[in-house]
């Protein structure tokens, strides 16, 4: 199962997830001048970072909006990147945050679990109801695909909805969502004990971290918020279980790390590698590894 594969990769390489949320402003001028088409620029930047970090990390996440913003050429850059990652046997997360009625969700599932945009995991928004997740289940049942569903996110506005108290238990809404995901996810657990239906939990809101981890012992977490959003290794380690059970995403902190160095434009991929190593050490020092 894909969740077993991810678990095993985390065991070997640690918890860092490299976020390839690639904006043209993040790319060195010399690289942008070398290629004419946006898809080539995006892909070559991503590829150099991948080639310098693939031995260090278990998974890569691509936020599709950064590619959609550049139209067809941008999406071609997205396609080339995920195809390259899959060709070198790296696990991929398509950060698409889709959520729609079941007939439309069926098309989203087909788009991102088959064909040109195929990835191993996608992120989903559950707030249209759980029938919006149903079309993804046949892919999860195959053992080859998984999802991370928004649970407790890292943005400040998360409290506007996720913190609403819901009857009959008068609990926060995100716990109602989490309990339902936990219930659905039981049949999709791998030999590692975790389910291929995971959750997105923000590393910037640590006050509930231990309770969330203890409540959802079999749920694998995608944890954003490290670095630029303010979360530290100490914060995010609270969501882990014996050093596993989650991957921690950093995007700008890795792919724009080169901007802190005089020779960064020429060595941007080297500095991305250094940022990954520093992040991994920070997390491992807190998780006791």
From Swiss-Prot:
HAMAP family: OMPdecase_type2. The keyword Nuclease does not apply. Transmembrane segments: none annotated. Its EC number is 4.1.1.23. GO terms for molecular function: orotidine-5'-phosphate decarboxylase activity. It comes from Petrotoga mobilis (strain DSM 10674 / SJ95). It holds the Pfam family OMPdecase. This is Orotidine 5'-phosphate decarboxylase. It catalyses: orotidine 5'-phosphate + H(+) = UMP + CO2. Pathway: Pyrimidine metabolism; UMP biosynthesis via de novo pathway; UMP from orotate: step 2/2. It is an enzyme of class 4 (lyase). Keywords: Decarboxylase, Lyase, Pyrimidine biosynthesis. GO terms for biological process: 'de novo' pyrimidine nucleobase biosynthetic process; 'de novo' UMP biosynthetic process. Belongs to the OMP decarboxylase family. Type 2 subfamily. NCBIfam families: pyrF_sub2. Disulfide bonds: none annotated. The active site is at residue 97.
